[in-house]
């Protein structure tokens, strides 16, 4: 359920914000337009948000700045510490992951996440979306930004291009984690009563907005 990558993110906690700002050349294209992407997700979110994989709290900060109530879920203790330092008392930050998490004390209208859903296998993504469908009423939404691919060939070409540039850390990451395709995601959302749209943000990342159609 993504926790197999926990050690990696506990090591990354200190330098994560530098990575998203483009200091790591291998990941510069992945995080291109990072601030704009987070703003897009924050603008699409409703008023009461359950956020998964908050990391150091960058999306959380934007949600709070827009006057939204946020319940943040993060499995990494060092990441939670960084987020708490950044956000102070403004957000509720809880230990959990995409599949196992404490329920918010009030109804939510949005589930949000950035750069994290790929930690789940496709089967786990299906399980997660099924859970979220039970939490949301009609009109509630899931707003995720994450790396995904048009099809398997696009994925293959991206990995090959990374290796050709000597970006072996990036290529290894793409092959190690569970990056999926748009058609798989569309099917998963549809199977659980969501209408979904995708908007490409850079060469890697798409914003997906899935709106609950049935109760």
UniProtKB/Swiss-Prot annotation:
InterPro entries xrefs: Methyltransf_11 (IPR013216), SAM-dependent_MTases_sf (IPR029063), Uncharacterised_MeTfrase_YrrT (IPR023553)
One of the Pfam families matching this protein, by short name: Methyltransf_11
Positions with a binding annotation for S-adenosyl-L-methionine: 53, 74, 97
Cystine crosslinks: none
Keywords of this entry: Methyltransferase, S-adenosyl-L-methionine, Transferase
Broadest EC class assigned to this enzyme: transferase
Gene3D superfamilies in UniProt: Vaccinia Virus protein VP39
Organism: Geobacillus thermodenitrificans (strain NG80-2)
Function as written in the Swiss-Prot or TrEMBL entry: Could be a S-adenosyl-L-methionine-dependent methyltransferase.
Official protein name in the record: Uncharacterized methyltransferase GTNG_2476
